[in-house]
Amino acid sequence: KAYMDYVDKRFRLLAESAPYFKKVKELGGRIDGNMSRVLSPGALDDSGAMCAAMIKAMTKGSKTDLMPLIDNYINYIMTKEHRLSDGTFARNRPFFNSVWLDDMFMGIPPVAWYAKVAGSNAQKYSDEAAK
């Protein structure tokens, strides 16, 4: 219970402050680099673990509306993260099409967990995580 309260309090802070900072960014203002990575992930490092943790918190009873953040993260993971032609997560640093175990750890679990909250699209995310 104490740990869940701790997690929920921090996720609530992100969920409640993200819309404000999103508006600031849209209006051309500068925002903190950490919040920028929440709003505009640029790597699995910015999105994977947070996405999976937020989904887990939701499935464990968090009352905070995390879906806008989760959807933003999963959109990055599914549509913007670099992949090989077969769909394997990869990166272009330090070398072109480098495959890292770390990317599997940060990419596959959030996709698999998203199947739990994806409603009628659950099979799509389960299949993606398994391939």
Predicted feature locations:
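Glycan-recognition and catalytic cores of secretory/periplasmic carbohydrate-active enzymes
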Residues: 1-131
